[in-house]
Amino acid sequence: MATLTVDFFCSVDGNGSAHGWPGYWGKEGPELRDYLVQKYAQDQVLVYGATTFRAFREFVADYDEPYYESLNALPKIVFSSTLREPLGWSNSTVISEDAVTAMARLKRETEKPMRSHGSISLNRALLAAGLVDFLEVTIFPAITGRAGYAALFEDGPEFDLDLVESTVLDGRTLKLVYVPHLHTGVPEGVGPQRRET
């Protein structure tokens, strides 16, 4: 069975984007670039919602990042009821059926790892359905405040997280990899205990 990793870049206050801020919140460094090159050099399937797919399709055409060649070469699927093939990005396939149903089937049918980046609505649904094996959060040293938007965890279900990897990139950006578990309540006896009188 394939694993699914949800990959989320965010500010310290949890926003995936911010008005008036550049890509990577202006904090891109050599270790971050090397990490991205290595990550996308791995054999995997990239998973997108329609909005993020359109954005990345434009990024790889208009910008020059060292890992974009790998993005072009890797197989990609986009969940969308409106997009039609040809999609204008090499090795891309559209899936129009319900994303949760389709992802559960895809995970059973293949061994190749899958990775979804951005795609807030899609990844909220996949997380809520318990289909995400790894949650990779890269936290950039910025607080975006009122300018921030696209928070993945806002208004969603609750999760307990097992930390399996932590790395500091360029001395300032934190990459955390978790195994998520839907939160089912706090066990009795956990947390501060009231003193008996």
Predicted regions and their residues:
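Enzymes that bind and transform nitrogen-containing heteroaromatic metabolites
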Residues: 1-197
